[in-house]
A protein has these predicted regions:
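Mobile cap/lid helix-loop segments that gate and shape the active-site cleft of serine hydrolases
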Residues: 140-176
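Short amphipathic alpha-helix adjacent to the substrate-entry channel of hydrolases
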Residues: 48-66
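The serine-hydrolase catalytic nucleophile loop
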Residues: 44-54, 79, 198
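Primarily recognizes the serine-hydrolase "nucleophile elbow" in alpha/beta-hydrolase
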Residues: 87-150
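C-terminal catalytic histidine-bearing segment of alpha/beta-hydrolase fold enzymes
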Residues: 201, 210-256
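Short beta-strand/loop motif that positions the catalytic acidic residue
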Residues: 180, 186-188, 192
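Conserved alpha/beta-hydrolase "acid-adjacent" motif
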Residues: 193-202
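N-terminal cap/lid segment of alpha/beta-hydrolase-fold proteins
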Residues: 1-28
Length: 256
């Protein structure tokens, strides 16, 4: 595996406009590509917190991975983070730079966790559907109205004000569903106390009503404390539970 750090998709953003490219040793024109997006309630963390997922996708699934930063809502409110991820997606699909040659960018996957799951959905559903192979939301904020009562403050920080009904429509992934939308996988632990599983359940209901392809991976983990229950405890960098990796890999291979 080879890592090319700090490829800028938007130079004016500085550090927040950077992504790291992970390339498998055996890159071919058939090597599939994934855009990955970290979580942190839209207001914290950076790309290194999702590097364990990027390493797994690259080293074990032989995929090319562009793992990105974006502007945090604590510094720049919505739509900044959404716009940044969308720009990163366009850049990964179409930028004519040497680092992005040699692998398949005709159709990419988009993947994220927690708030990054929301941003993955918002990105994948707003890019041209014929260019997106699939979207993976790992314990993501898929339905914002189901999630809002759990932590209203993160929405006030995201938007820069207390949200109104029209705000929910703008930041809701379901708003951007069409019959041509790409396949979507939502994974969620039943007792996630950071983002409730109802967020994934309600979103997948909307996907089903829309007539597009939605898949669920709901599971149980014996963990305590405030947690999504997605990471193997004490893993550095964070590594997903094996059953999660297996289910995500199945989705990626089926939709490649």
């Amino acid at each position: 595996m080879r890592i090319i750090n700090s490829i800028s998709y938007c130079p004016p953003l500085g550090f927040r406009g950077l992504g790291d490219l992970y390339l498998p040793d055996n890159v071919t024109p058939e090597t599939r590509a994934v855009l990955t997006i970290h979580g942190g309630g839209w207001s914290a963390q950076e790309k290194n917190t999702f590097s364990g997922v990027a390493i797994w996708l690259c080293s074990e699934l032989n995929m090319a991975v562009y793992n990105i930063n974006y502007r945090l809502s604590s510094i720049a409110p919505w739509p900044a983070c959404g716009d940044d991820c969308l720009e990163a997606g366009r850049f990964f699909l179409d930028a004519d730079i040497p680092e992005f040659q040699g692998f398949d960018r005709k159709r990419i996957f988009v993947m994220g966790g927690s708030a990054g799951g929301h941003l993955a959905l918002m990105t994948g559903l707003r890019l041209p559907p014929e260019r997106i192979a699939g979207i993976v939301s790992i314990s993501g904020i898929a339905d914002v109205e189901a999630d809002f009562p759990v932590d209203p403050m993160r929405y006030k920080i995201l938007l820069g004000h207390t949200p109104a009904k029209e705000d929910f429509a703008e930041i809701s992934p379901a708003t951007y569903l069409t019959p041509a939308s790409p396949a979507i996988l939502c994974t969620h632990e039943h007792h996630d106390n950071v983002v409730p599983i109802a967020s994934a359940e309600r979103f997948l209901e909307a996907v089903q009503k829309n007539g597009s392809a939605g898949e669920a991976c709901f599971y149980d983990k014996d963990e305590n404390g405030y947690s999504h229950r997605i990471w193997i405890p004490d893993s550095v960098p964070h590594k997903l539970y094996q059953e999660l990796e297996n289910r995500i890999a199945k989705f990626l291979f089926e939709h490649a």
